[in-house]
């Protein structure tokens, strides 16, 4: 897929999951960095909704430690059915219910199979490119 994407010169997608886009300093710093350092290399997808079950499984395969810190009840959540109301629900509600860590956003580079929760981790990823 990445060879095909390269041939088409399409940007790859980085998703940023956050419960509070406007007031989250870590989220805003990641956004500012991506806007100023990546030009047209990426499509940035901002999400204030809980990831799908498939996305949770994919992210868990990438880095279970980071994901477990972001989603406190990860083991329980991964056993839910894909149609459970949690998936796709507002992250602000998930914070209230204890299903999402309010301290940091979560970014995911789907193509490079990388994820993190802070500015430093995304800087390190982009420096490798």
Swiss-Prot record:
Transit peptide limits: 1-21
Record's keyword terms, sorted: Mitochondrion, Oxidoreductase, Transit peptide
The protein, known as: Putative redox protein FMP46, mitochondrial
Family from the record: Belongs to the FMP46 family.
A molecular function GO annotation: oxidoreductase activity
Principal subcellular localization: mitochondrion
Enzyme class: oxidoreductase
One of the GO BP terms on file: negative regulation of transport
GO cellular component terms listed in the entry, alphabetical order: mitochondrion
Active site, UniProt feature: 94
InterPro entries: Fmp46, Thioredoxin-like_sf
EC identifiers of the protein: 1.-.-.-
Pfam families, per database record: DUF1687
Organism of origin: Candida glabrata (strain ATCC 2001 / BCRC 20586 / JCM 3761 / NBRC 0622 / NRRL Y-65 / CBS 138)
Function statement: Putative mitochondrial redox protein which could be involved in the reduction of small toxic molecules.
Compartment(s) of residence: Mitochondrion
